[in-house]
Amino acid sequence: MKADIHPDYHMIKVVMTDGTEYETRSTWGKEGDTLNLDIDPNSHPAWTGGQQTLVDRGGRLSKFKKRYEGLGI
């Protein structure tokens, strides 16, 4: 394996949508960071069989709806 070409691999904490926390090794963030999941196997419709809900991350969905609200579609 070549030296100094791979990202740092360290421990992070992952928090699922139901509040469950676990630690895993990852290249995301830095040592000790917390990754809060928006969607996980406990809440994703593909695994739960439930209704699909739209997650408006960053206001993109709201911006789209506002832009095209006058079309009446």
UniProtKB/Swiss-Prot annotation:
A Pfam family this chain is assigned to: Ribosomal_L31
Keyword tags: Ribonucleoprotein, Ribosomal protein, RNA-binding, rRNA-binding
GO terms for biological process, alphabetical: translation
UniProt keyword Ribosomal protein present: yes
InterPro entries: Ribosomal_bL28/bL31-like_sf (IPR034704), Ribosomal_bL31 (IPR002150), Ribosomal_bL31_A (IPR027491), Ribosomal_bL31_sf (IPR042105)
SS bonds (residue pairs): none
Listed GO MF terms: rRNA binding; structural constituent of ribosome
Gene Ontology cellular component terms for the protein in this record: ribonucleoprotein complex; ribosome
Function description: Binds the 23S rRNA.
Record's subunit section: Part of the 50S ribosomal subunit.
Family: Belongs to the bacterial ribosomal protein bL31 family. Type A subfamily.
Protein name as it appears in the record: Large ribosomal subunit protein bL31
Originating species: Chelativorans sp. (strain BNC1)
